[in-house]
Curated annotation (Swiss-Prot):
The reaction(s) this protein catalyses: guanosine(1516) in 16S rRNA + S-adenosyl-L-methionine = N(2)-methylguanosine(1516) in 16S rRNA + S-adenosyl-L-homocysteine + H(+)
Organism: Cellvibrio japonicus (strain Ueda107) (Pseudomonas fluorescens subsp. cellulosa)
Residues annotated as binding S-adenosyl-L-methionine: R109, D110, E125, R126, D185
Methyltransferase as UniProt keyword: yes
InterPro entries tied to this protein: 16SrRNA_methylTrfase_J (IPR007536), SAM-dependent_MTases_sf (IPR029063)
Gene that produces this protein: rsmJ
Superkingdom as given in the UniProt entry: Bacteria
Protein name (database record): Ribosomal RNA small subunit methyltransferase J
Lineage: Bacteria, Pseudomonadati, Pseudomonadota, Gammaproteobacteria, Cellvibrionales
Length: 266
């Protein structure tokens, strides 16, 4: 992980020490991001969980993996179910909820949507920073759901996470372990600043970086999947690996390129 300081109050120092040792992070106890001037980003551990926060008084909001409130939870409750474009892209239908490998998990938002639709998710994330944020979000969601939301608990229990490079993970799969669907949403440089991308997410992208080897991942995914590979792309972006998909589903700002290996089960 990049050497980003981990900031916490004294109450959270013991938990922060464990996290800092795991990811080799410096700890700053008692400091607050607003007054830190010698680094651009910090990780903050407090009662709301783990978050990435830009420093300074005019910094945008914190970035965290969140599944119990906000837009992600609203989509779980009111998002349109199997009629959503992502559901159609991966092949969710009555009687079939595919096993999905999310090879570029990020903050887990698309994986969570698929899990709400009944899919079992294996999420792979190679960035230690993003892995730490996502693991924390899943742990908080599990604790919350176990206490007060059994339906959410079923969703979260369909999501598994591994810290690994997806290429290495795929190469280690035996044929009987191949997922039904592999989902790719690689991170690319923004061609322009979009009003649709919040300032805090632009900051997140700037520190996490881009998936420059994404073109290599597509052919590898096609060799290690049962039914299809789904690639999420900005609507006007070129095809991944310059490879023409079997078909596409287009939305207002993004699209899904679907590469089929064989027909989904009826």
């Amino acid at each position: 992980m990049l050497s980003i300081p981990l900031v916490c109050s004294s109450d959270f120092a013991p938990a922060a020490q464990v996290l800092a040792q795991e990811f080799n992070l410096p700890i700053r106890v008692g400091e607050v991001p607003e007054t830190i001037g010698d680094c651009e980003f910090v990780l903050v551990l407090d009662e709301t969980g783990l978050a990435l926060q830009q420093t300074g008084r005019k910094a945008p909001g914190a970035v965290r993996a969140e599944f119990t409130e906000g837009a992600v939870d609203h989509r779980r409750k009111f998002g349109g179910g199997k009629g959503q474009m992502i559901a159609k892209a991966v092949g969710v239908k009555a009687g079939f909820s595919p096993r999905v490998l999310d090879a570029t998990a990020g903050l887990g938002r698309d994986a969570f949507v698929l899990a709400t639709l009944g899919c079992r998710l294996q999420m792979i994330e190679r960035s230690p920073l993003v892995f730490a944020l996502l693991r924390d979000g899943l742990a908080r969601a599990h604790a919350f759901a176990h206490a007060q939301d059994r339906e959410l608990l079923q969703v979260v229990e369909r999501m598994e996470l591994a810290a690994q490079d997806s290429k290495t993970y795929l190469q280690g799969l035996a044929p009987e372990q191949f997922p039904d669907v592999i989902y790719l949403d690689p991170m690319f440089p923004e061609r322009q600043k979009s009003a649709d991308v919040k300032k805090e997410m632009r900051a997140f992208h700037s520190i996490v970086g881009t998936d420059e080897d994404a073109d290599v991942l597509l052919p590898l995914a096609l060799e290690h999947v049962r039914f299809r590979v789904v690639v999420k792309r900005p609507r006007k972006a070129p095809f991944l690996n310059n490879q023409i998909p079997s078909y596409q589903l287009e939305g207002k700002s993004s699209r899904y390129d679907i590469y089929t290996r064989k027909k989904l089960p009826d």
